[in-house]
């Protein structure tokens, strides 16, 4: 018979100082299974699985827990067995959520000593499946705000039950839908967290700039009479190069990044073809498509490489398009649901501030999915509401990252240690004037810091930048206050670099649970961006694709390579 132990009994059993031996903690982990936590009167919590995981070469031992909060809020949690740093971390999800992917969310954090939790937000689905919304008001409530809060409270109860004491500090860290979760927590449940990192928060549409729209509309205006795209992937490289040539130095630094796209006066008509040779220019129809992407869609100057696989469909796949996730309720024409349950648009954070909590709000300038204007406008509105920029910066700061795509990726320095920044601010009072990040080498895993280091100074109104250079591990650091060094690239043929980029894009997409189509788009994007970084012309592109080592590539990666070969064969 399943044992049911209520929280008071568990606390009585597990009270006291941390055990001297990991074996005792492993036994405590197993004892959690089958328990029930009365953490909230209206949110009973049940632990369905708890098992100690032994230490390995990659991490120390930890307790893996699975449970749910009534009615359907599933969560996964990792608790370090003998190396807890005293902190509790909740990770958010992406898109439509629907999966408590605890290893993906918490694996690296438990290695650093965090007790870490993630929830599925109350439903089963893929990242882009919104069918769960139909006739599911409770599901919308959970997705909107309840699930994050009740599972956060449950996680704190588990920390106390397992370690015999409450966490010293509690943090939230996530992007996109997860960024929305973070803002909702600051607005609705200001005492849940001491520090929140909210990156590219979704569903801030009511604050302006970009209205939700179906991607099929983009597909429609980019489809010609022959059912092929008017603006193919390869033209994104041409447009991006023109934007960089014109606007790179607007911030005083030649680094291939657009520091503030609002100051870039590039117009697509500048690339209008003057002859019948259209390979290095834009036709009138292509100019019209680019204009719509900048104005109707709201894409920023400098984001062009991130259109590949997102706005621009492959020439060999008529009628198919990768669909980013948009605001669920707005897309269904229900603004009441959006305002009350989904949109994190309340600028009044007095309770969060008075709890002495801190907020890092982050947005990539080249984000293809969550456009920068709503994030900027939300912060500016918050600053006005909270007594002005100076008063707001005491507890909440906005960081705009040049060249960064949605959550990460792109050409900017998107590999950033956000947890070091937020814990330093919360626990030591070191408000981060800068975020330090790197742009990994093509094909490198996300935790490889092997390229020039960018120091990004973010002021809420100006988004100014300073830089210094770091040439990579084992290399001599060269300080350049007004610029950065040329990235250190591996000495290998372009085909080998492409193989690495394809393999890494495939790995990341598969690990994140993306659909086949999304993984395919990610691989194509990696190929084109590698071409751009290498400055490869048409002949070099064809040769590089032909030289890709196909041994060991997955079926989806092979399909991407075949499609790229077909596209490069077109005029």
Task: Locate predicted features.
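Bacterial N-terminal signal peptides
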Residues: 5-16
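Catalytic-loop region of hydrolases
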Residues: 22-87, 91, 100-105, 240, ...
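Short, solvent-exposed loop/turn and secondary-structure capping segments
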Residues: 75-78, 100-105, 127-131, 183-188, ...
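Cap/lid segment of the alpha/beta-hydrolase catalytic domain
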Residues: 95-164, 210-211, 322-341, 400-405
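Alpha/beta-hydrolase fold nucleophile elbow
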Residues: 165-176
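Glycine-rich nucleophile elbow surrounding the catalytic serine of serine-hydrolase chemistry
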Residues: 175-184
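A catalytic-pocket lid/entrance helix-loop region that shapes and gates access to the active site
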Residues: 185, 191-298, 400
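C-terminal subdomain of alpha/beta-hydrolase-fold enzymes, centered on the catalytic histidine
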Residues: 294, 298-460, 467, 491-498
């Amino acid at each position: 018979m399943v044992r049911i132990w209520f929280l008071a009994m568990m606390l009585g059993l597990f009270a006291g100082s941390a055990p001297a031996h990991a074996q005792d903690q492993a036994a405590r982990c197993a004892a959690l299974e089958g328990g029930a936590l009365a953490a909230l009167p209206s949110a009973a919590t049940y632990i369905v699985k708890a098992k100690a995981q032994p230490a390995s070469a990659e991490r120390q031992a930890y307790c893996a827990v699975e449970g749910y909060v009534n009615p359907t809020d599933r969560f996964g949690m990792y608790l370090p067995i003998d190396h807890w740093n005293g902190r509790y971390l909740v990770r958010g999800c992406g898109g439509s959520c629907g999966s408590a992917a605890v290893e993906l969310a918490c694996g690296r954090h438990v290695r650093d000593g965090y007790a870490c939790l993630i929830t599925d937000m109350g439903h089963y689905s893929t990242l882009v499946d919104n069918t769960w919304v139909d006739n599911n008001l409770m599901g919308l409530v959970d997705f909107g705000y309840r699930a994050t809060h009740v599972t956060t409270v449950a996680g704190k109860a588990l920390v106390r039950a397992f370690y015999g004491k409450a966490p010293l500090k509690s943090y939230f860290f996530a992007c996109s839908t997860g960024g929305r979760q973070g803002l909702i927590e600051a607005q609705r449940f200001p005492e849940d967290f001491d520090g929140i990192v909210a990156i590219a928060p979704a569903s801030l549409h009511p604050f302006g700039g970009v209205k939700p729209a179906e991607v099929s509309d983009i597909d429609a205006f980019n489809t010609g009479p022959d059912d092929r795209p008017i603006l193919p992937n390869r033209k994104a490289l041409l447009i991006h190069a023109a934007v960089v040539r014109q606007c790179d130095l607007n911030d005083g630094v030649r680094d291939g990044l657009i520091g503030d796209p609002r100051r870039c006066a590039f117009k697509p008509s500048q690339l209008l073809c003057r002859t019948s040779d259209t390979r290095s220019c834009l036709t009138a129809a292509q100019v019209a498509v680019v204009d719509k992407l900048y104005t109707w869609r709201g894409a920023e100057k400098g984001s062009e490489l991130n259109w590949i696989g997102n706005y621009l469909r492959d020439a060999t796949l008529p009628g198919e398009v990768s669909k980013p996730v948009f605001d669920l309720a707005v897309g269904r024409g229900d603004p009441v649901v959006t305002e009350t349950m989904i949109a994190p648009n309340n600028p009044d954070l007095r309770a969060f501030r008075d709890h002495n909590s801190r907020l890092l709000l982050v947005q990539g300038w080249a984000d293809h999915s969550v456009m920068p204007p709503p994030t900027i406008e939300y912060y500016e509105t918050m600053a006005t509401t909270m007594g002005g920029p100076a008063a707001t910066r005491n507890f909440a700061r906005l960081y705009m990252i040049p060249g960064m795509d949605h959550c990460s990726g792109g050409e900017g320095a998107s590999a950033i240690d956000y947890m070091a920044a937020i814990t330093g601010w919360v626990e030591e009072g070191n408000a981060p004037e800068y975020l330090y990040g790197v742009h990994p080498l093509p094909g490198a895993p996300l935790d490889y810091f092997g390229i020039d280091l960018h120091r990004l100074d973010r002021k809420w109104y100006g988004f100014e930048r300073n830089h210094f250079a770091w040439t990579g591990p084992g290399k001599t650091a060269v300080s350049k206050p007004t610029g950065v060094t040329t990235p250190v690239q591996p000495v290998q043929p372009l085909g080998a670099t492409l193989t690495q980029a394809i393999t890494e894009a495939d790995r990341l997409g598969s690990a994140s649970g993306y659909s086949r189509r999304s993984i395919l788009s990610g691989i194509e994007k990696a190929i084109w961006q590698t071409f751009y970084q290498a400055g490869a012309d048409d002949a070099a592109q064809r040769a590089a694709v032909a030289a890709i080592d196909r041994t060991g590539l997955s079926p989806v990666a092979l399909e991407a390579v075949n499609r790229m070969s077909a596209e490069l064969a077109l005029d």
